[in-house]
């Protein structure tokens, strides 16, 4: 059986911007038979995410991430349908997902590494399992709960950077749902700002490309900032931290502005900003959702309930075809997406 796959063809360099040409599509042969415990799957959707930029380097700089190897298939969040199974708990026609799904049209996988999903949780929108009802949703929910210390009735102001992206667009809504009295998003286009305030219920939005971020934040957050969901790092985060209140909290979700630079993760703050953090007793801890696996099942059910009740709005940017994985990744890294960037590999979900 001949299938297509995407391999890493070249590295952008630790300080380079990734381009679509760093990836290559090739045809390979897939065995016709599977072994006990294995399943053959057809890929329906693949995810591209900022953390993958680290995997393009020879060393990721993160102890929980292994680098992609040159000329080897890339992997990440994926979802597919089982075409054949020799695994006792998985059957033909089941929908399954994995955090380590190969970028292939079809694959033979170890069934023990797959998670069966229920289409009813997403009203049939299977790609949502790679976004709002999946890892980005869990990251946003558990991050706000564990590191944001949000409590209803506390009159807290929350700021979200990268607010129109996969995690940011969810984190702001979740902040409201858990009790924040004011939620402000930071993003890079007028269209995204409008999306945040008119569709997602953010109280205000700051466009970092059209004005002074610090001044816009002072206007949008007259009572200062109590919770900061940080997706970007860099100058934007420095501006936010400078306006945070005593005993406030930073949820360190990502640092996309720093991923193309040869710096440690999380990167250290400039001395003046670090002094503010210490003086005001602001918590800033690296958040790893994979450390909270016992919270995944109740978290997915909560996210699904909010979605079905219309309280959690979900937005996707969808590219089509395995050949566009590199294009979608490059676009996502430069802010071309609103909501979760997804790549549809096959439209046929039948087994």
Curated annotation (Swiss-Prot):
EC category name: oxidoreductase
Amino acids binding NADP(+): 165-168, 192, 208, 231, 253-259, 287-289, 337
SUBUNIT field: Monomer.
Subcellular location: Cytoplasm
Official protein name in the record: Prostaglandin reductase 2
Gene name of the record: Ptgr2
Taxonomy of the source species: Eukaryota, Metazoa, Chordata, Craniata, Vertebrata
Annotated source species: Rattus norvegicus
GO cellular component: cytoplasm
SUPFAM superfamilies for the chain: GroES-like (SSF50129), NAD(P)-binding Rossmann-fold domains (SSF51735)
Primary localization class, coarse: cytoplasm
A molecular-function term among this protein's GO annotations: 15-oxoprostaglandin 13-oxidase [NAD(P)+] activity
Catalytic activity: 13,14-dihydro-15-oxo-prostaglandin E2 + NAD(+) = 15-oxoprostaglandin E2 + NADH + H(+); 13,14-dihydro-15-oxo-prostaglandin E2 + NADP(+) = 15-oxoprostaglandin E2 + NADPH + H(+); 13,14-dihydro-15-oxo-PGF2alpha + NADP(+) = 15-oxoprostaglandin F2alpha + NADPH + H(+); 13,14-dihydro-15-oxo-prostaglandin E1 + NADP(+) = 15-oxoprostaglandin E1 + NADPH + H(+)
A biological-process GO annotation: prostaglandin metabolic process
Pfam families linked to this entry: ADH_N_2, ADH_zinc_N
Family to which the UniProt record says this protein belongs: Belongs to the NADP-dependent oxidoreductase L4BD family.
Keyword terms: Cytoplasm, Lipid metabolism, NADP, Oxidoreductase
EC number: 1.3.1.48
Protein purpose: Functions as 15-oxo-prostaglandin 13-reductase and acts on 15-keto-PGE1, 15-keto-PGE2, 15-keto-PGE1-alpha and 15-keto-PGE2-alpha with highest activity towards 15-keto-PGE2. Overexpression represses transcriptional activity of PPARG and inhibits adipocyte differentiation.
